[in-house]
Amino acid sequence: MEKKTIVLGVIGSDCHAVGNKILDHAFTNAGFNVVNIGVLSPQEVFIKAAIETKADAILLSSLYGQGEIDCKGLRQKCDEAGLEGILLYVGGNIVVGKQHWPDVEKRFKDMGYDRVYAPGTPPEVGIADLKKDLNIE
């Protein structure tokens, strides 16, 4: 079976490279073709990479607390670019301060994200979810 392709990166003005490398390593070892666009990445770069690579999913991370602002509108931009239905995952420290996680998760799902991960979620959880969502295994 052909490897599924994912676009991975750190959204917005966030430069946390270590977590991004860990995710890249974990998803690559799990059998995915990872297109890592790195840190400090605007939405348009994720979209362009997804189109160019015919990606099956876009995985965004954020650690600096501004993920909610950075992630807003991505689903609509994906749809407008012809990426209707592409899986969108986001995780990390995606909001400012300590907030009730179910409320945070709901806000991101309302923005069109398929999966939303709290700080400290092991990569294996995202890998299992992605395999399930892509009907792998």
Swiss-Prot record:
One of its GO terms (molecular function) is cobalamin binding. It catalyses: (2S,3S)-3-methyl-L-aspartate = L-glutamate. The keyword Transmembrane helix does not apply. Adenosylcob(III)alamin binds at residues 13-17, 61-63, 93-97. Belongs to the methylaspartate mutase GlmS subunit family. PROSITE patterns: B12_BINDING. The gene is glmS. Its EC number is 5.4.99.1. The keyword Nucleotide-binding does not apply. SUPFAM superfamilies: Cobalamin (vitamin B12)-binding domain. It is an enzyme of class 5 (isomerase). One of its GO terms (biological process) is glutamate catabolic process via L-citramalate. This is Glutamate mutase sigma subunit. Catalyzes the carbon skeleton rearrangement of L-glutamate to L-threo-3-methylaspartate ((2S,3S)-3-methylaspartate). Pfam families: B12-binding. Pathway: Amino-acid degradation; L-glutamate degradation via mesaconate pathway; acetate and pyruvate from L-glutamate: step 1/4.
